């Protein structure tokens, strides 16, 4: 089910929009200590600090630009991420792929 959701939402392998599959891999490595990154894991974890990626994707008005700005800015409750521009594009594409399709 998860693979089908990713495949359905992946528009291009590597474009300005980023690569959904690569973004999922980066998110699992760099983000899952504090966030729920997988769509099927929506229940709260004991040590969850940040919002689930599914919830971020479904914030009204959330855009790729907003996610990119967030990922390149420092935040007191979040470790400073050192991601390449491609990784930022990939994570952004992955997060946006988790939007509910209404």
Regions flagged by a language model, labelled:
Residues 1-9:
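Bacterial N-terminal signal peptides
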Residues 17-49, 98-102:
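Periplasmic/extracellular electron-transfer cofactor-ligation site
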């Amino acid at each position: 089910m998860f693979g089908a959701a990713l495949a359905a939402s992946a528009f291009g392998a590597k474009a300005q929009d980023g690569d959904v599959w690569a973004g999922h891999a980066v998110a699992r490595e760099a983000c899952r200590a504090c966030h729920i990154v997988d769509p099927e894991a929506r229940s709260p974890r004991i040590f969850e600090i940040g919002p689930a990626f599914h919830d971020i994707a479904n914030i009204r008005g959330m855009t790729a630009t907003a996610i990119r700005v967030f990922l390149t800015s420092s935040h007191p409750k979040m470790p400073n991420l050192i991601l390449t521009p491609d990784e930022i594009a990939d994570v952004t594409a992955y997060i946006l792929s988790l939007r509910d399709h209404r």
